């Protein structure tokens, strides 16, 4: 099949180079967006009298027919077409004849592909936002049921202070909310139309860029034709936001992997979201969070690929930009599947071991800060109180006992301000309840945050 640009050349393209150069194997993903873009362009050419009404309608009807055949599975784009743009144009010409050759008037593949990928990515961002929202709902539901369930809080992966499990899960709601806000900002910059910039310099053909932008639902148009076809910063922004989403998914995945180990036993996997071993019959493997954790590197790699692709490219359009699609397509697929998998895991695949969680916070030194705070409330300087508690911890470790095992007289050998009420202050439920500063893990604060989230998510 001859190329539309082949008249400039005397010789034929090397078959391997032809295959190497082609993008149809992956940019066929954009078929519906390319048709949508072309329909808007045909309408505009009619409005500006570049095409007659009959010509425009004939082109639009042809494009709609191609769309229907694709949806019905009767048209499968592929080789020998070079890319999805030529593929559809060739199909259109075969379908409606010479009129189809007029469709490309006043545009280039450079602004065309930029429009297509923005249309595609805009839809995908909206879909990902829905998946993030559903994940937040799942986290909210578990949090709402576990206000009074305690879990050890960690710093440096060492027991630090007891927390409400709800408070712990709400931290992830905050992270995923920021992810949604970032995507919203990215979407605003994706939602700008490059159509009409042509190859790089605009066109002398009478066009109406605002008309096509409005037809396609764009919020604005690129004001500089070179910029319109020269940058893929919106792809990089999306990939960056996606990398952050995956980092948050990876962190909660890592925690779940730890929680379901025999060493932690804070939770267990249900049969719906676990697999076994081909050799070891006792195994129940956390494949879902492990896969999510593993796929995070894949999305990070796509971000690096896009950054490297763009870094040394002079203005304006270059063939390098063909390499933007596969990373973005795979990023969308990966993010979407991981978000859905995590939501299913939270809804159906994990059960918290409340007894083990409560037992854990009753049998450690995570209430040490409260021991120091007790003395602070007795007007003892904090640094002095800190040192006193450090001595008590050392003493308890030497005896293989906990604070709760000490007699009052033993406490008083370290400081005479210790009284009988010290035991009440060391109770983990009271420890958590007392952390009532704004944004803290205190039960009243957690309830306040749950109410705030209920308004955000459900109203």
Swiss-Prot record:
Q: Which GO terms describe its molecular function?
A: argininosuccinate lyase activity
Does Amino-acid biosynthesis count among this protein's keywords? yes
Its annotated pathway reads: Amino-acid biosynthesis; L-arginine biosynthesis; L-arginine from L-ornithine and carbamoyl phosphate: step 3/3
Main location group = cytoplasm
The EC number(s) attached to this protein equal 4.3.2.1
Query: What chemistry does it catalyse, as a reaction equation?
Result: 2-(N(omega)-L-arginino)succinate = fumarate + L-arginine
* A Pfam family it matches: Lyase_1
Q: Which Gene3D superfamilies match?
A: Fumarase/aspartase (C-terminal domain), Fumarase/aspartase (Central domain), Fumarase/aspartase (N-terminal domain)
GO CC terms, sorted? cytosol
Official protein name in the record = Argininosuccinate lyase
């Amino acid at each position: 099949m001859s190329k539309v640009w082949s008249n400039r050349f005397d010789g034929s393209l090397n078959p391997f180079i032809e295959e190497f150069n082609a993008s149809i194997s992956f940019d066929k993903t954009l078929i519906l967006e390319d048709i949508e873009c072309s329909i808007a362009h045909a309408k505009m050419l009619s409005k500006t009298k570049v095409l007659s009404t009959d010509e425009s309608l004939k082109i639009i009807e042809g494009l709609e027919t191609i769309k229907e055949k694709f949806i019905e599975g009767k048209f499968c784009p592929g080789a020998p077409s070079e890319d999805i743009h030529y593929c559809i144009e060739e199909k259109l010409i075969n379908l409606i004849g010479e009129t189809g050759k007029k469709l490309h008037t006043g545009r280039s593949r450079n602004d065309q592909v930029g429009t297509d990928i923005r249309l595609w990515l805009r839809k995908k961002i909206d879909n990902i936002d829905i998946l993030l929202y559903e994940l937040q709902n799942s986290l909210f539901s578990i949090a709402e049921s576990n206000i009074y369930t305690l879990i050890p809080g960690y710093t440096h992966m060492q027991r630090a202070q007891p927390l409400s499990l709800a408070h712990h899960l709400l931290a992830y709601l905050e992270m995923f909310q920021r992810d949604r806000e970032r995507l919203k900002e990215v979407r605003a910059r994706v939602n700008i139309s490059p159509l009409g910039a042509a190859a790089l310099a605009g066109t002398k053909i009478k066009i109406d860029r605002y008309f096509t932008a409005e037809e396609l639902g764009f919020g604005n148009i690129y004001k500089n034709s070179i910029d319109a076809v020269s940058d893929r910063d919106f792809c990089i922004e999306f990939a960056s936001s996606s990398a952050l989403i995956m980092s948050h998914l990876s962190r909660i995945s890592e925690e779940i992997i730890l929680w379901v180990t025999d060493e932690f036993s804070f939770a267990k996997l249900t049969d719906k979201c676990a697999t076994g071993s081909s050799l070891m019959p006792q195994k129940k493997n956390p494949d879902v969070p492990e896969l999510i954790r593993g796929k995070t590197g894949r999305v990070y790699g796509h971000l690096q690929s896009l950054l490297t692709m763009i870094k040394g490219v002079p203005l304006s359009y270059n063939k390098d930009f063909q390499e933007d699609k596969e990373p973005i397509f795979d990023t969308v697929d990966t993010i979407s599947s991981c978000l859905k998998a995590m939501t299913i895991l939270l809804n159906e695949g994990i059960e918290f071991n409340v007894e083990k969680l409560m037992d854990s916070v009753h049998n450690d030194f995570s209430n040490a800060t409260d021991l120091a705070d007790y003395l602070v409330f007795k007007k003892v300087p904090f640094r002095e109180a800190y040192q006193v508690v450090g001595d008590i911890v050392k003493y308890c470790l030497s005896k293989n006992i906990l604070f709760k095992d000490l007699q009052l007289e033993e406490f008083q050998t370290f400081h005479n301000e210790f009284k009988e009420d010290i035991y009440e202050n060391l109770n983990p439920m009271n420890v958590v309840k007392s952390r009532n500063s704004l944004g803290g893990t205190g039960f009243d604060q957690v309830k306040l945050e749950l109410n705030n989230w209920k308004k955000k998510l459900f109203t």
